[in-house]
Swiss-Prot record:
Protein name in the entry: Neurexophilin-4
Magnesium in keyword set: no
Any one of the GO CC terms: extracellular region
InterPro entries named in the record: Nxph, NXPH/NXPE
Entry-linked Pfam families: Neurexophilin
Its biological purpose: May be signaling molecules that resemble neuropeptides and that act by binding to alpha-neurexins and possibly other receptors.
Amino acid sequence: NCHVEYEKTNRARKHRPCLYDPSQVCFTEHTQSQAAWLCAKPYKVICIFVSFLSFDYKLVQKVCPDYNFQSEHPYFG
């Protein structure tokens, strides 16, 4: 019932001195992706994926819309 209408990915990588040894070089990397689907109902579903990675830290997060937002009949699926 759905197809991808829009897709985009941004990446950034920065070098900096390492926290555990400032004489060494470490990096941080950031990636952000966005996609939009057009569905038959018709309505759009947009999810954003955010990830952050460094030597001692990693974060991956998925953000999606509230299906109940501005809906006559709330979605409980």
